[in-house]
Amino acid sequence: MPEYKAPLRDMRFLIDEVFDFHGRYQALGASDATPDMVAAILDEGSKFCEQVLAPLNRSGDEEGCHFDNGVVTTPKGFKEAYAQDVEGGWNGVASDPAYGGQGLPHSLGLLLSEMIGASNVSWGMYPGLTRGAMSAIHAHGSQAQKDLYLARMTAGTWTGTMCLTEPHCGTDLGIIKTRAVPNADGSHAISGTKIFISAGEHDLSENIVHLVLAKLPDAPAGTKGISLFIVPKFLPDAEGNVGARNAVSCGSIEHKMGIKASATCVMNFDGATGYLIGEPNKGLHCMFTMMNHARLGTGMQGLCLGETSYQGAVRYARERLQMRSLTGPKAPDKPADPIIVHPDVRRMLLTMKAFNEGNRALAYFTAQLLDTEHLSQDAAERERAADLLAFLTPICKAFMTETGQEVTNLGMQVYGGHGYIREWGMEQLVRDCRIAQIYEGTNGIQALDLLGRKVLGSQGKLLRGFTKLVHQLCQAQAEHPQLKGQVAQLAALNAQWGELTQQVGLAAMKNADEVGAASVDYLMFSGYVTLAYFWLRIALVAREKLDAGSGEAAFYEAKLATADFYFSRLLPRTAAHAAAIQAGAAGLMSLSAEQFSL
């Protein structure tokens, strides 16, 4: 299994030099988020991830979760690692101090989440889903619900889930069959079956708090009739003491391609006691608070697994001896040269490096927007941050997982035949990453959300909010002595972005299928241009540091070389996506269903 080491130098480069986290924390009044606090989270968090979680990654995949008559047991070592997580207070880093959290900015929580996901993504899903459930309760629950649930979930002694999918519906939640019948005491009896429920049952915590979508007896049809309920595994009393077992049980666990140490459960609700969150028939709105949290977390999985794969691939490429360099021996004292000297291996490694480091910048920028949305005292600034978040969330989820899958595949390819063998660990990263393109809304759905709802639905407002940032950067750096070529390339694509949007919008006025036909290519085009914006920002900082005579010349030179690779080798992929967007819907919709022959 590749040995994971947190990429602390690259993380600190973005935190301190590109995005100035400390300056932003001061502006937002986050006085506790000092440089020393950031350093402590990075240093202690990396030790926990490298020394405790990473060693459990392969064994967890090999063993998987065990199911026995409704009881789910996590792999060996998971429970002990979770106890250390609880003892360290890691689950509450960015949680509300009113409920026992440390109250630090969301961006600091993301740093920890990155290291957890890269060291053991399956383990990380248990506390990760809990934080998502907490966000929904915090935003929409009553004060009594917050008081009862949040402190225990913040501590980690209770965990959380979200229960949406049913056997007959995943994306189309408007046709769910789970029902909520009012009880005399104000609670509801929840009946139905949910599937694909991550962390639905396990042995890590004393209670599990399920957030369940269901319909009331008089609910309107479709998504306008969905309500959200808290359904605890054990019914707590008013003081939070765990009481009687609720009528919710795990019917089975799934046998999956990857993330095998994360329990994916079929959950049966047989008249279970549930408590309404928010208003009746407004459950989807409440759940999307959690879903947006989960989508950003899922995007991070692409980065996390890509980082671990890259680290393994680089080490292997430096050590594996095969053939001689085309330009002559580079290690004449050895029987062959290390494969890292070969151009195609370089292509793979640079692709991995460029996507990982670009995606990390995108993730950290997005995390800063979360900080602004939650902490800024300026209403207009909060609104701008919320708009940018709405626009970037589907890009983060879909583009980061699409490129993350490419990166893990390339990592396996660098190993050649050994990459296909389980004991090396590279194929596990491919398997674990694959689900990220599917759950929390498939990438096709993210593409529809981006183009249909976020861009066209806002009459272009959300797109303009981001392209304005790109335009301002390009305008300011148009005459940069070393980087003006990359600036011009980005400026041209930024303009084309608006033109493509207008073309699709006009075509969709005559045929709604034009949106669906263009959406995935539109999202990928958007992702490549978005990463180019961040790579330009990275390159500008690196160039400035080199010009100032930095003592870390090799680090900054590598940034410039990787930026050049991105602009010259990866960004041109936008041309293919633009051509596909302009091809329109006709080529996709001309065949009848019967003409898809078997």
Show which residues each predicted segment covers.
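Alpha-helix capping/hinge segments and adjacent helical runs
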Residues: 2-5, 259, 365, 387-465, ...
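A glycine-rich, basic-preceded beta-loop-alpha segment at the flavin cofactor/substrate interface
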Residues: 196, 235-251, 256, 263-294, ...
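Glycine-rich cofactor-pocket loops
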Residues: 25, 30-32, 62-74, 286-297, ...
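Internal maturation/activation junctions in enzymes
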Residues: 65, 78, 126-130, 141-183, ...
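Amphipathic, small/basic residue-rich leader segments at the start of a protein or domain
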Residues: 1-124, 148, 579, 583-598
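A structural-propensity feature for long, helix-poor, extended segments
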Residues: 131-133, 142-145, 442, 450-494
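A short core secondary-structure module
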Residues: 187, 191-245
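C-terminal amphipathic alpha-helical interaction region
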Residues: 111, 457, 473-598
